[in-house]
A protein has these predicted regions:
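C-terminal recognition in membrane/secretory proteostasis and scaffolding
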Residues: 57-58, 62, 87-204
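Short, surface-exposed secondary-structure boundary micro-motifs
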Residues: 2, 8-9, 68, 156-157, ...
Length: 204
């Protein structure tokens, strides 16, 4: 799909439009400090000053918010990223309504299911979110989640990997009770978890 990136490159040139295509969806692992990732990748030029600008399609629909680039030199090299509007909109609405962002939290350490994990746990597919640790007293612990469980569905939505799980939980508000489906020792187990509020990350 053809997309247009709108921004003010380098804070010098004023409103500028660049054109490119959507190169990929659901990009992750761009930052160690941000667990909530599912970026749109585009080759539309995004330079300093473009962050926060709109990424639109040829119909004028907002599809994302320009966010960052991947570069080894500091210059744009054809790999830019935007936050999907579906993720940005609820955050915007929370900030307008309350002045803060409240994310759901279950207090477990999650990882994606690799082929090695799938083989070790006798899973049919290398899909789902692997529970590596459960914090005592956290919502996940109270719901009955255990180490080595594999979460395959959250609130009726299939969970393909860690990113799916983290984003779905975070975008679901605290104090909501939602169903989980997990694979435990080859058996499908259904649980219900009441989400807590994710603690704020203290930046150094």
């Amino acid at each position: 799909d053809v997309v247009l990136a709108i921004g003010n490159p380098f804070g010098v040139f004023g409103n500028t439009v660049t054109m490119g295509i959507v190169s990929a969806l659901g990009r992750t692992q761009l930052s160690d400090s941000n667990p909530f990732e599912s970026f749109i990748q585009t080759d539309a030029a995004i330079n300093q000053g473009n962050s926060g600008g709109a990424l639109i399609n040829t119909n004028g629909d907002l599809i994302g918010i320009n966010s960052s680039i991947f570069t080894r030199t500091g210059d744009f090299s054809g790999i830019g990223f935007a936050i999907p509007s579906a993720l940005a909109k609820p955050i915007m609405e929370q900030l307008i309504a309350t002045g803060e962002v409240k994310r759901g939290y279950i207090g477990v350490n999650l990882g994606s299911v690799t082929p090695d994990i799938a083989q070790r746990l006798a899973l049919k597919d290398a899909k789902g979110a692997f529970v590596g640790a459960v914090l005592d007293g956290a919502p996940g612990s109270r719901a009955g989640l255990r180490v080595n469980d594999v979460i395959v569905e959250i609130n009726g939505k299939a969970t393909n990997d860690r990113t799916d799980a983290v984003n779905t939980i975070a975008m679901t508000g605290p104090e909501q009770t939602i169903p989980l489906k997990v694979v435990r020792q080859g058996e499908l187990v259904e649980l219900k978890v009441t989400l807590g509020k994710r603690p704020q990350i203290k930046r150094q």
